């Protein structure tokens, strides 16, 4: 499911024809009527009217385009859906609708979902397991509930500290000093070390990054496991 549904469609070809093109490529033996029926089923699944197939992309709202992108992603019967920031540029109400559609389709078809996002609230709602990444490397991975309740890596804690809470008194959100590293050059040791608030105490910034299991199904970068 593409990052920006606004730019995912060819502007001069109707939505239905673009989905039929994918179906023809993957299922060359399908008849035209079979493909039309498949598109109708997909549109019903994501909450779109059949008439959307005969419209051009500019005739659809942002939310409708994103629903159509989800239908396109499902058209070839995948086992895994990769959703890359699928609610970018949509208002909050439409975002919630799209997320509900993705969850509904996931449960209906029994799909695995890889959801890529910087939105902590969405990750908490949509996932069973999470992998926190920094500078292209996974620094912590495990069950969502466990990591939210007991974050171990300094970057994971910093992410959660930067998210406003609806509970308790208002307080100033924390931020990290410095900037993310350039990925052009090879990084020796821990890529988070220059910004890590624990680098002088509990971390080992010279250790090359790799995951170690600290609890059942809970993995964290070895750099954060002390100066041993």
Describe each PLM feature range:
Residues 77, 82-86, 90-171:
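P-loop NTP-binding/switch modules centered on Walker-like glycine-rich loops
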Residues 12, 52-56, 169, 183:
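Signature (C-motif/LSGGQ) region and adjacent switch/coupling loops
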Residues 33-51, 79, 160-161:
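Conserved ABC ATPase "signature" region
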């Amino acid at each position: 499911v593409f990052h920006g549904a606004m730019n995912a469609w060819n502007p001069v070809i109707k939505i239905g024809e673009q989905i039929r093109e994918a179906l023809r490529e993957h299922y060359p033996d399908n008849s035209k009527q079979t493909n039309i029926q498949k598109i109708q089923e997909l549109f019903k699944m994501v909450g779109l009217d059949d008439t959307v197939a005969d419209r051009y992309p500019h005739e659809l709202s942002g939310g409708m385009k994103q629903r159509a992108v989800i239908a396109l992603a499902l058209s070839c019967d995948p086992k895994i859906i990769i959703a890359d920031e699928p609610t970018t540029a949509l208002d909050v109400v439409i975002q919630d609708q799209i997320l509900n559609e993705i969850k509904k389709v996931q449960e209906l078809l029994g799909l695995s979902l890889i959801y890529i996002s910087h939105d902590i609230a969405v990750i908490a709602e949509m996932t069973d397991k999470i992998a926190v990444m920094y500078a292209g490397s996974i620094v912590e991975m495990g069950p969502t509930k466990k990591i939210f309740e007991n974050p171990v890596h300094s970057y994971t804690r910093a992410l959660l500290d930067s998210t406003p809470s609806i509970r308790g008194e208002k307080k100033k959100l924390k931020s990290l000093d410095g900037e993310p590293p350039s990925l052009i050059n090879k990084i020796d040791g821990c890529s988070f070390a220059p910004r890590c608030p624990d680098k002088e105490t509990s971390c080992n910034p010279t250790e090359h990054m790799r995951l170690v299991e600290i609890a059942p199904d809970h993995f964290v970068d070895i750099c954060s496991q002390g100066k041993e």
